Amino acid sequence: MKLPIYLDYSATTPVDPRVAQKMSECLLVDGNFGNPASRSHVFGWKAEEAVENARRQVADLVNADPREIVWTSGATESDNLAIKGAAHFYATKGKHLITTKIEHKAVLDTMRQLEREGFEVTYLEPTTDGIVTPAMIEAALREDTILVSVIHVNNEIGTINDIAAIGELTRSKGILLHVDAAQSTGKVDIDLSKLKVDLMSFSAHKTYGPKGIGALYVSRKPRVRIEATMHGGGHERGMRSGTLATHQIVGMGEAFRVAKEDMAAENVRIKALSDRFYKQVENLEELYINGSMTARVPHNLNLSFNYVEGESLIMALKDLAVSSGSACTSASLEPSYVLRALGRNDELAHSSIRFTFGRFTTEEQVDYAAQKVCEAVNKLRVLSPLWDMYKDGVDISKIEWAAH
């Protein structure tokens, strides 16, 4: 077994060999290297054909019309384009937007920017399980609400929001719904012919495709209009200018094709791995699962080990690639804002580790990881005076520490 072991599939995934093969065919002089916008020769036509084939493959996974798929540089750009694009286009109808406190930073920071431009944003608090309900959204609606943005599968805790029910509500009120689905492709069924979703963001690198490419679903029926945030040659029907990266687009298409083919079997396998891992660590004292046990993807186990500092646990697990918080924010020493929104105290938020399993995770790796986690937690607790106090029956939350 090779070390270190990668258990951070929610941060990024390796490119599937089938995807890499297809991408490599679009780079060299003997390959399909043309500019898809070159209309005057066969190199351009071939590249355009490959791009449109990939567009169909992405649309097929989510049961959309290929004409509703707009290429972007990733889910961050898709979130920006969807939220800013819709807010600016429909600003004359209203200036109120609704989102949740547990969105990805790409949504939260986009909302913050719109607040600086004069929009008003309501940030909803989830349940302690990490779920946002239609009732919460309904209670926050106003006459001037134009857009609701809700994450589908949470990147930190893996919980799944009921997008179908939320879509019924927003559509009945004539309000646009944007969904960040970066973490859900290949994990959860998405049927955009049934879901009442207006805008949906996708990423390739969370689904065994390359980094630097994503897509935005923009509904045609009912027709949704967005203002471009990137200006230039008018590519992608004017919504997103810039020469299309054929090799990355082809990679995303193939990744989504494979996801559609393998999803059912892969979910069963990963659920078995996740359960196997949890069974081996669940007897640790003061262990907490963050997020709903039922409405979550099996790929994600976010655990808090009380009386152990998450950062020191990560250092102790030097042969495991895991994370505390999300990859985008875990460089800061602030406790995870997602866990704080769930009502976790600072200590539990700081002691959290996200284990995420994927296509290339094996039983052997999971067993090794579980063993190392148990050893490290027990070892660190032996060193912890707080653990001693807890074992002696002291209620640590009642202690007033002297300030230096």
Curated annotation (Swiss-Prot):
The modification N6-(pyridoxal phosphate)lysine is found at residue 206. It is an enzyme of class 2 (transferase). The active site is at 328 (cysteine persulfide intermediate). Its EC number is 2.8.1.7. Pathway: Cofactor biosynthesis; iron-sulfur cluster biosynthesis. [2Fe-2S] cluster binds at residue 328. GO terms for biological process: [2Fe-2S] cluster assembly. Its cofactor is pyridoxal 5'-phosphate. It catalyses: (sulfur carrier)-H + L-cysteine = (sulfur carrier)-SH + L-alanine. Its main location: cytoplasm. Signal peptide: none annotated. Keywords: 2Fe-2S, Cytoplasm, Iron, Iron-sulfur, Metal-binding, Pyridoxal phosphate, Transferase. GO terms for molecular function: 2 iron, 2 sulfur cluster binding; cysteine desulfurase activity; metal ion binding; pyridoxal phosphate binding. InterPro entries: Aminotrans_V_dom, Aminotrans_V_PyrdxlP_BS, Cys_deSase_IscS, Cysteine_dSase, PyrdxlP-dep_Trfase, PyrdxlP-dep_Trfase_major, PyrdxlP-dep_Trfase_small. The keyword Transferase applies. It holds the Pfam family Aminotran_5. It comes from the Bacteria. One of its GO terms (cellular component) is L-cysteine desulfurase complex. Homodimer. Forms a heterotetramer with IscU, interacts with other sulfur acceptors. Belongs to the class-V pyridoxal-phosphate-dependent aminotransferase family. NifS/IscS subfamily. Master enzyme that delivers sulfur to a number of partners involved in Fe-S cluster assembly, tRNA modification or cofactor biosynthesis. Catalyzes the removal of elemental sulfur atoms from cysteine to produce alanine. Functions as a sulfur delivery protein for Fe-S cluster synthesis onto IscU, an Fe-S scaffold assembly protein, as well as other S acceptor proteins. This is Cysteine desulfurase IscS. It comes from Pseudomonas fluorescens (strain SBW25).
